[in-house]
From Swiss-Prot:
Entry-linked InterPro entries: Adenylosuccin_syn_GTP-bd (IPR018220), Adenylosuccin_syn_Lys_AS (IPR033128), Adenylosuccinate_synth_dom1 (IPR042109), Adenylosuccinate_synth_dom2 (IPR042110), Adenylosuccinate_synth_dom3 (IPR042111), Adenylosuccinate_synthetase (IPR001114), P-loop_NTPase (IPR027417)
Keyword Chloroplast listed: no
Positions that bind GTP: 12-18, 40-42, 304, 330-332, 412-414
Native organism taxonomy: Bacteria, Bacillati, Bacillota, Bacilli, Bacillales
UniProt EC number: 6.3.4.4
BP GO terms, sorted: 'de novo' AMP biosynthetic process; IMP metabolic process
Cellular localisation: Cytoplasm
Official protein name in the record: Adenylosuccinate synthetase
Pfam families, sorted: Adenylsucc_synt
Residues binding IMP: 13-16, 38-41, 128, 142, 223, 238, 302
Cofactor details (free text): Binds 1 Mg(2+) ion per subunit.
Residues holding substrate: 298-304
Name of the gene: purA
Keywords: Cytoplasm, GTP-binding, Ligase, Magnesium, Metal-binding, Nucleotide-binding, Purine biosynthesis
């Protein structure tokens, strides 16, 4: 039995999809455990670039089971479209399994997300407007609709009708906009349910059977630790738990069966949407990193905010997620910068903070304390081992590991799979 969790250590977009795809070669089962189609990951397979939002990146390997776990919220329309996209590109999806306990995103969730963000104006959270938060709200309020319900038309119709009594009043009275027809939703979305029914299973059984049989299971996190609803920069967070602890809840696998947690990080920091960002760069260096690193959201297309590497953030991620291994990505993007900076701690009213504060008011007044390191000019995009890196690049990587307290397992020097390099194995 061997299991590995891949989590983002920052605010998402760290390159988890590529690392998951890379580690998928050794895995026999790949599972997602939280989030929905608000997550976007780009995978290069057989020379082709694919963008996925719901389906695990292991789908390209016919011999690997891919699981959408119970902790996810699924937009059936988006899922059917993503399946069609894969089929159009000749990808066999018969290895997909969808949890019958996962909750469903319906049109009223998406509309609620949009009108509420618009209502907040300047105080908006910066959601992807995909209905993720409202779906998780219904789940917590115990009025959510699950995949198992979607497949039973009478049950589905009764639940939608009951929920819309409240939702339509909310739309019409509070938001002063049109509500929805229960009949139209049921007809459209039951049809989507019919198209995905063959993939639906009790995925907790699938995953535990695989682990008990000694198979290698890879759990693929979405977003990042700093977007975790409990451990992130609340309220500028997602509505689920991307941390490794979310695996046990979102997949139905007990904590004793988790062995390695790979924390994925860029060699700098990015963030999409609103919220605090202590090391943000609003200058030419930030613009350069954004351009060279192609820092635009897979899901939203929005320019990502860019900043220096923040070891306070990644140490926080290590602690709350039990990270055992570091995957450091996009080192090549820093090539050509004369001086590099790493945030080692924060200064708050004369006090040095080594740990990430919970209060956003405190965080807003924190100034990053930087350590400066010399940059490098050499092209590193073809490097295969740490020893091949220029001395300054190697020193930078080593310092990141020292400041975060996480040993290096993987590093990448470019966007392609061939530019991802393993330092030590994670699967037994």
């Amino acid at each position: 039995m061997s299991s590995v969790v891949v989590v983002g250590t920052q605010w998402g977009d760290e390159g988890k999809g590529k690392i998951t795809d890379y580690l998928s070669e050794k895995a026999e089962v790949v599972a997602r455990y939280q989030g929905g189609n608000n997550a976007g990951h780009t995978i290069v397979f057989d020379g082709k670039k694919y963008k996925l939002h719901l389906i695990p990146s292991g789908i390209f390997y016919k011999d690997k089971i891919c699981v959408i776990g119970n902790g996810m919220v699924i937009d059936p329309k988006a899922l059917v479209e993503e399946l069609a996209y894969l089929h159009d590109h000749g990808v066999d999806t018969s290895n997909l399994r969808i949890s019958n306990r996962a909750h469903v995103i319906l049109p009223y969730h998406i509309k609620l997300d949009i009108v509420e963000e618009d209502r907040k104006g300047a105080n908006k959270i910066g959601t992807t407007r995909k209905g993720i938060g409202p779906a998780y709200m219904d789940k917590a309020a115990r009025i959510g609709i699950r995949i198992a319900d979607l497949l039973e038309k009478d049950t589905f119709a009764a639940k939608v009708a009951a929920v819309l009594e409240e939702k339509n009043r909310l739309f019409e009275k509070y938001y002063e906009t049109d509500g929805f027809s229960a009949e139209e939703i049921v007809e459209e979305y039951f049809h989507y349910g019919e198209q995905i029914a063959k993939y639906v299973a009790d995925t907790s059984v699938v995953l535990n059977d695989a682990l008990d049989d000694g198979r290698r299971v890879l759990f693929e996190g979405a977003q990042g630790v700093m977007l975790d609803i409990d451990q992130g920069t609340y309220p500028f967070v997602t509505s689920s738990n991307p941390i490794a602890g979310g695996v046990t809840i979102g997949s139905g696998v007990g904590p004793s069966k988790i062995h390695h947690v790979v924390g994925v990080s860029k060699a700098y920091t990015t963030r999409v949407g609103d919220g605090p960002f202590p090391t943000e760069l609003d200058d030419e260096i930030g613009d350069r990193i954004r351009k060279v690193g192609n820092e635009y959201g897979t899901t939203t297309g929005r320019p990502r905010r860019v900043g220096w590497f923040d070891s306070v953030v990644v140490r926080h991620a290590r602690r709350v997620s039990g990270i055992t291994d570091l995957s450091l990505n996009s080192i090549d993007v820093l090539t050509g910068l004369k001086t590099l900076k790493i945030c080692t701690s924060y200064r708050y009213k004369g006090e040095v903070l080594d740990e990430f504060p919970a209060s956003l008011n405190v965080l807003a007044e924190c100034e990053p304390i930087y350590e400066e390191l010399p940059g490098w000019e050499e092209d590193i995009t073809g490097v295969k081992t740490l020893h091949e890196l220029p001395e300054n690049a190697r020193t930078y990587v080593e310092r990141v590991c020292q400041l975060t307290g996480i040993p290096l397992t993987v590093f990448s020097v470019g966007p392609d799979r061939s530019q991802t390099n393993m330092v030590r194995g994670v699967f037994a």
